[in-house]
């Protein structure tokens, strides 16, 4: 399920598919691993204009992704970094959208819901190293609270600004 957010952002709710193909794809593996750990926030993603620096740094090519709509339209992108997310859930994976920009998930319908804060167990310096730029740059207007509890790194909570005030999940 896609939930469009303000500012060219969106939230995607995913679940494990009981299909052999989902176990072969890194994204399916990431979803299954998070589900097996009790569920919660699987990870986060950063939209980039150029995947080449990430391909070079990670030593592998980005892979194609797509989603077909019932009316035949197709959303297409390239992605890299899911394996990194599986190994270290504090780091994002990267997407480069291709094709028709009107199909971007944030455009599914108008939304005033705004993501305002991520609470991440981990290290800003580790994520900056992963991104190759200060972690604040791709997050723009989203605050990040870095905490380091004993346990697995990753997203602990997300705060959204709604018409009725802040909601933290």
List where the protein language model places each region.
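Charged/polar, solvent-exposed surface patches and flexible loops
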Residues: 46, 56, 129
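Short acidic (Asp/Glu) patches
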Residues: 23-33
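Short, His- and charge-rich active-site/binding loops that engage polyanionic ligands
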Residues: 13, 20-23
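Extended intrinsically disordered, low-complexity coil regions enriched in Ser, Thr, Gly, Ala
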Residues: 124-140
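Compact, glycine/acidic-enriched structural inserts
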Residues: 38, 46-47
